[in-house]
A protein has these predicted regions:
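Conserved N-terminal beta-strand and adjoining loop/helix that marks the start
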Residues: 1-11, 30-33
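A residue-level structural signature of the nucleotidyltransferase/glycosyltransferase Rossmann-like core
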Residues: 10-11, 26, 109
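A conserved beta-turn-beta hairpin within the catalytic core of GNAT-like acetyltransferases
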Residues: 20-25
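Unchanged
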Residues: 33-57, 68-129
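Conserved S-adenosyl-L-methionine
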Residues: 60-63
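Charged phosphate-binding loop/patch that engages nucleotide di/tri-phosphates or the phosphate backbone
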Residues: 131-152
Length: 152
């Protein structure tokens, strides 16, 4: 996941659409899954371009968000969630990008301030994602699926 900053106090926000395969929706930053044979950084660059039209560079790794599913996933979990599993999201920031923004099947995108994002319908636990990205003293958020994440 990547927070892209425009240098004018705004970040690129995606209005993630609810899908049958993934119930995680709302305002979030672009990002996705790592494909086989792909590094984490390469996956962020690819996912951001696929979802927003922007090509990012000079990525700064801020920390991680991890959560565990104990037993069966909650009914509203993403279809790819497996029983007794752990998921890790790598959180990046950048101010370096090229291209023009465009929406994708994942959702529409627009520039907004963090205050505007926070006052909107954010995806679950996005506040904890933002804290890890912005607070140099916090580098991880952890929790069990369906619960609020703890900052570490």
């Amino acid at each position: 996941m990547c927070m892209i900053e425009d240098g004018h106090g705004r970040v690129l926000v995606q209005h993630r659409r609810p899908k049958a395969s993934n119930s995680w929706h709302g305002l979030a930053f672009p990002g996705g899954h790592v494909e086989n044979g792909e590094s984490v950084t390469a996956s962020v660059i690819r996912e951001v371009e696929e979802e927003t039209g922007l090509v990012v560079s000079n990525l700064h790794l801020c920390g991680i968000v991890e959560w565990e599913i104990v037993g069966e996933p909650p009914a509203d979990s993403a279809a790819e969630c497996r029983p007794d599993s752990k998921y890790i999201v790598f959180l990046f920031r950048t101010t370096s990008y090229s291209g023009e923004i465009r929406s994708s099947s994942e959702g529409s995108v627009e520039w907004m301030t963090l205050d505007e994002m926070r006052s909107g319908d954010m995806a679950p636990n996005m506040e904890e994602h933002i804290r890890v990205m912005l607070d140099g003293d916090v580098n991880e958020a952890y929790g069990l699926s369906g619960q609020t994440l703890r900052l570490l």
